[in-house]
Amino acid sequence: MSVNEDLSHLGVFSVDQENLERDVTNTASEYIAHESREIEKKRLQKVRKEISSVKEKIRRLDERIDSRLTKISVKENFRKQLSKFRDTLQSLQSDENDIKRRLNNEDSANAPGIGAFSTEELERQELIRTGKVTPFRNLSGLQKEVDFDDESSIREAVIKSEGTYYETAPHLSSEPSNIDHGIIPRDEKDEYVTVDAVTEKVVTAAIDDGDDLVYRQRLNAWCANRKELRDQASASENNKDRGEFEGKDEWLLPHPSKKGQTFEGGFTIPGDIRPHLFRYQVTCVQWLWELYCQEAGGIIGDEMGLGKTIQIVSFLSSLHHSGKFQKPALIVCPATLMKQWVNEFHTWWAPLRVVVLHATGSGQRASREKRQYESDASESEAEESKTSIKLRGASSSFHRYAKNLVESVFTRGHILITTYAGLRIYGDLILPREWGYCVLDEGHKIRNPDSEISISCKQIRTVNRIILSGTPIQNNLTELWNLFDFVFPGRLGTLPVFQNQFALPINIGGYANASNVQVQTAYKCACMLRDLISPYLLRRMKLDVAADLPKKSEQVLFCKLTPLQRKAYQDFLQGSDMQKILNGKRQMLYGIDILRKICNHPDLVTREYLLHKEDYNYGDPEKSGKLKVIRALLTLWKKQGHRTLLFSQTRQMLDILEIGLKDLPDVHYCRMDGSTSIALRQDLVDNFNKNEYFDVFLLTTRVGGLGVNLTGADRVILFDPDWNPSTDAQARERAWRLGQKKDVVVYRLMTAGTIEEKIYHRQIFKQFLTNKILKDPKQRRFFKMTDLHDLFTLGDNKTEGTETGSMFLGSERVLRKDNSSRNGNEAEDIPARDRKKHKIHDKGKKVNSSKVFEKMGIASMEKYKPPQESNVTKTNSDSTLGDDSVLDDIFASAGIQSTLKHDDIMEASQTESILVEKEATRVANEALRAVSSFRRPPRQLIPPQQSTNVPGTSKPSGPITSSTLLARLKQRR
């Protein structure tokens, strides 16, 4: 029995999420193209009106110049005015020609950002995207035409950029070797090296090296084992190389039986590690080495689940093996991930001494004060806010212990791991010292330039700074600037200069009333910005580099409100609080929060009262439509042998979910949220992955959805959607990642017709806008024009299906106002052919229209007809994550809809277009020069108190308005 059939009695409507989102985004693209065309028509009318006005002025001036009554001195003045008007006319006619070309040219392949690239550049970006070369490599010396299906062609194309590798062809493929190397057993389907056989050998994997005895025991065992293998190999070779290795430390010697890979500069990936890395991971290690040689930093923005942690561990281990690990490395990460980092270092390269500066560390004195400081070091969201919660400082005794711990890292090596909160608490111990390397895991936490943690991180004294983030660009250009200002100080100039020269021109170019010069200037500035950051931002996607991952499917389950939920929802919409919100007397977010609680469970609204009410069944599952679905799903999956991750946004909802799970027969669960002791979090994760006793793992999205590896589950449920699509994406990627052996199914639950469905619509569109390529018309401003009032509506209970479901199922759906609609609501008619084709709609019924989509102006929906499944994902990937993905992110994060179509090759006779192009290029080059003049050398180590790069140390003189910039552009013209 399928899930859909099993839940049919609950009124659940299921839609495949991938197809749904593709259908919605395709419709949005059509709408945006239509809106862009309308804007161009209005722009053309405006230009033609101005041309007519200027021509009329020229005609009048000609008449007055030709008149016998006009004095000679006055005629000279008129001729000067006439010359200016003719120049203006020439510029306006140039704009008119550009606009007409854009209107006539509907071939997206001619849009800027596609045709602007040469074949060589496209091939280079394809190699970078698929993890075969680094961004610093060009195609000189590579084969210009590579058949990527041919193994020998791949080897021929990448061999000159990847260094010397002593193994044979299988290691140049996009997959790791399936050869049995003796130490780490693998089968053909294994995709992740950290298998149980390895972790069982490393008995101290979960214990860091704050206790020096632990480190010594592990190091001695590793050296003895390696030396024994070397002696065996030397004996078989008649002691051929035995004298060569005498007197050297074991970690500096090559592996006895497995070959490493050496790059230019004496950097070698040891044989202990290299055979177990994927092709794209080796490329990342090479890229990190290239950054290290430049004394620059970068952002590893690989998609979640591709092993960003492994790539850093491999690089630092290779530095140590190559004898280039001169100063200790600092790793800052969320508290939940500290033990994971320790485990990976111990598994991949035992000689590295890894110390945790945290109350959960294994130092002899840390345990005495563990309870006292766990609350101080908890990973709250305060780091992302502008006003951080003031953390309580460490006691004098613990501070002395921390000081000795940091000192030991500098005297005995090698890695210090702490949290973002710990960086602030122990800043006086960490910030004054010079570090060899610094890594910020989940580095998007410092995206706010004014936050305290961002300021602290920028004071770390090292030039080798790396950010790990699966979602490096989320909202706007200021956040992008702040991330780059950490990894490469001065690369994008100071914040005021960056906003002046890049952010404002790019933003203005996206306005509907932007002139032709402003549109092209925005494009040129964005191209310049892309070129500045692309070598230092490495982002690869699973679909491009990890094709052997199990399948992942996503379903959206639309659940009906229970009668109690619907009554509570309607009562709030008709209540006094709602009127205050609509009148602006109360915060709109208050109403949103109440409605979201009702959608989850009505008891959450008055939780404090009902929780202590006598004889009241708090959290009764029968009161929540989604909770009834959860219980049915988990019962079914228990029978089928599936294990589930169940995510919710709040701990209060987890409490109710826990109540609903307790009376389910034979369903065992564990739980982790913000209140879970940090010392227990990794143990909970490991226990769930290894122990199949637990069927369900209850998690909050913020704690359990951040960097945690939960491949023990193959089902994921997102109980309630988040405004930020990257938050839900982080959660759903916990199971679908390297190491997963089963197909993964993700279910989103939402109540039909409520605020949750509208939040989901905004998620789809926000993700759609983030993934747009430059060729698409201006999209974001259209959606920004909608207000939040449409959130406070409720779909008709009698309607079968949902607003989103209708969008997906209808072959065409026209939104229009129906004067005879019930209750005065706006409605839509479902075409008769749809009612016949889809049984979900009853004859004669009308479905409530979405005010969201009507305000957005979506006129119709085309039914999505999926092609062959094997080609769907790849084709979509190529279109949305193609060669201009970095430029795409820049425009999306700036709040731009997109640029307009332009002819990329101008004819020589079109002098007006050449002038516009020249002016746009000049403005972009001026922006580049301005940024470069404020860039400080990356080699310079700035003490914390002298750093001019820290946000807040130099404030902008004042905001520059749009009118000011428009005036400047007018003067330039």
Swiss-Prot record:
Source taxon at top rank: Eukaryota
Intracellular or extracellular location(s): Cytoplasm; Nucleus
Coiled-coil regions listed in the entry: 35-107
A Pfam family it matches: SNF2-rel_dom
Residues holding ATP: D302, E303, M304, G305, L306, G307, K308, T309
Record bears the keyword Nucleus: yes
Domain annotation Helicase C-terminal: ranges: 629-789
SUPFAM superfamilies linked to this entry: P-loop containing nucleoside triphosphate hydrolases (SSF52540)
Chain location of the short sequence motif DEAH box per the record: 441-444
SMART domains: DEXDc, HELICc
GO MF, one example: ATP binding
Protein name: DNA repair protein rhp26
Organism: Schizosaccharomyces pombe (strain 972 / ATCC 24843)
